[in-house]
From Swiss-Prot:
It is a peripheral membrane protein. This is D-alanyl-D-alanine carboxypeptidase DacA. Substrate binds at K231. GO terms for molecular function: serine-type D-Ala-D-Ala carboxypeptidase activity. It comes from Haemophilus influenzae (strain ATCC 51907 / DSM 11121 / KW20 / Rd). The gene is dacA.
Length: 393
């Protein structure tokens, strides 16, 4: 594999989530994380995907109402694709009747009434209504099992290794589980893919049928940290769970997940500790700009002699504060002799980022333009060039 060290201009602006390979639990760089009381937790940077600190991040837990984040994702996609509309009126059937969910969170749906998709969606996100999840599941997919199947299709699509859903609401089931890492990834997808859906997560209250209920995410009221959403969950077996996301004035966004916290208030305290620690000790910056060339490479057997290399997506890394000038980058090609045909977006190597002598992240290196095949004489010439080159390598 060809390795080349190259100077890459690091940019300071921030945009959408990017896919990065990061060295997970080793991301602390000697920065001592806070003491967190939870069975499992994760702190992830939204833009880079870096895990800044974690405890048992892949341990399977009962998600409780964190399940509703995936329910919300399915609903948001259906709205975005025009399969359903906020103004659609949904008739509440027997299975979605609020009376079927005693001693659990609900929006108090009455049998045979009609409720808009917009209200039901808020019932899911803001007040964690179990009845609302069933009503939306039946409206979108015809029945709950079909809806759950769609939820699990997204589990596969997102590459989640420790998640399986059996309900849209999250009440405990032996075959329903998720992990802190997987919930952070689901949260990032909601923020990135469905910005209109994510806006609802910041709403502090929801009134339906003259019943006003508050969002259970108490961090939305905390003026010392800019939390703008995500979801709580609790059952006796799950303990207290919370996914929270917050931003800073320079557009850094973190996602925290705590699961299995012993107390209601504790999940907010532990989440806040994680978020404040992350913002105090780390910074995220853009390393590759979408569509911008970072290098040019010789191509053989092509109708062009060279091809531009770069990335089709913005890419970011997260490092300890004050370390940006110490980051080094190199690019590695899978094959030192690139051969046509090449297609725009084709991955031909990677850019590797290093700090303090350790590889900390990598991004796909892609072809920035198509390269077709050369004619017979061009191919013959390049064959001769490579043959001679091989004799001296």
């Amino acid at each position: 594999m060809l390795k080349r060290t190259t100077k890459i201009a690091f940019l300071s602006s921030f945009v959408a989530l990017s896919a990065f390979s990061v060295s997970a639990e080793d991301m602390q760089f000697g920065v001592t994380p806070p003491q967190i009381t939870a069975q499992t937790y994760v702190l992830m940077d939204y833009n880079s995907g870096a895990i800044l600190t974690a405890l048992n991040p892949d341990q399977r837990q009962y998600p409780a109402s964190l399940t509703k984040m995936m329910t919300s994702y399915v609903v948001g996609v259906a709205l975005k694709q025009g399969k359903i509309h906020n103004t659609d009126m949904v008739t509440i059937g027997e299975s979605a009747w609020g009376r079927n969910f005693p001693d659990s969170s609900k929006m108090f749906l009455d049998l045979n009434t009609q409720v808009s998709v917009a209200d039901l969606n808020r019932g899911v996100i803001v007040v964690s209504g179990n009845d609302a999840t069933v009503a939306l599941a039946e409206h979108i997919s015809g029945n709950v099992p079909n809806f759950v199947e769609t939820m699990n299709k997204y589990v596969q699509q997102f590459g989640l290794k420790n998640t399986n859903f059996t309900t849209p609401h999250g009440l405990d089931d032996p075959n329903q589980y998720s992990s802190a890492r997987d919930m952070a990834i689901i949260g990032a997808h909601i923020i990135r893919d469905l910005p209109e859906e994510y806006k609802i997560y910041s709403e502090k209250n929801f009134t339906f049928n003259k019943i006003k209920q508050a969002n259970r995410n108490g961090l939305l009221w905390d003026k010392t940290i800019n939390v703008d959403g995500m979801k709580t969950g609790h059952t006796s077996q799950a303990g207290y769970n919370l996914v929270a996301s917050a931003t800073t004035s320079n557009n850094m966004r973190l996602i925290s997940v705590v699961m299995g916290v012993p107390t209601y208030k504790g999940r907010e305290v532990e989440s806040k500790k994680l978020l404040q620690w992350g913002f105090a000790n780390f910074e995220t910056f853009k390393t590759l700009e979408a569509g911008k060339e970072i290098s040019e490479q010789r191509v053989y057997y092509g109708d062009k002699n060279s091809v531009k290399l770069g990335a089709l997506m913005d890419h970011f890394i997260t490092i300890p504060k004050g370390k940006q000038s110490e980051v080094k980058a190199r690019y590695e090609l899978a094959d030192k002799n690139l051969q046509a045909p090449l297609v725009k977006g084709q991955v031909i190597g990677k850019v590797v980022y290093q700090l303090d002598g350790k590889d900390i992240a990598s991004a796909n290196l892609q072809v920035m333009n198509d390269v077709g095949e050369a004619g017979i004489f061009g191919k013959l010439w390049d064959w001769l060039v490579l043959t001679v080159k091989g004799l001296f390598s």
